[in-house]
Amino acid sequence: GPVSKVISVSSESELAEKFGAPDNNTFKYFLVAASFLKYGNALKVVRAASGHVNATADGNGQLIKNDDDYDDNYADGSLSVGNWVAKYPGVIGNSLKVSLITQGISDFSGWAYSGSFDAAPGTSEYASDLGKTSANDEMHIAVIDEDGVISGTPNTVLETFAFVSQAADAKKSDGTSNYYKEVVNSQS
């Protein structure tokens, strides 16, 4: 869950949903909070975290504490830690893997996650409507539980984002953004 942000919790199940089930490292904190919730239904929780950021491919991690921290400091794309970063630090975020395919990658059927999508990416309706019929701006994104920490089964596909666009101004037919960064950030 988020770090350095006050979160209201009204039940033990909501506590587990927002901050994860207890494990060997968190059970003593979780059980105190759960005990409080047996007698009341209005607990305010603030998660603390160390500054250790070690779950990266290149060794240069970035600690993003919560949505506000991301929006205020990183939403402009100034991170230099890679293409993707988990919304919250910890074991759950460390288990996430992101895989994507663009129209330019010719072997859609050979992509490990092609079965999660109806068809290969191509040119979006938005680009076509602008006369860019060969823009090939679409991509598919799969978010995977690589270690099985979230789902219990390694390599489980958790989320898919089909036919999102690489064009920053791309819109869906309902007028909402279809730009892949905005879609993933708002829906994941």
Please state what every model-predicted region is:
Residues 1-188:
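Surface-exposed assembly/interface segments
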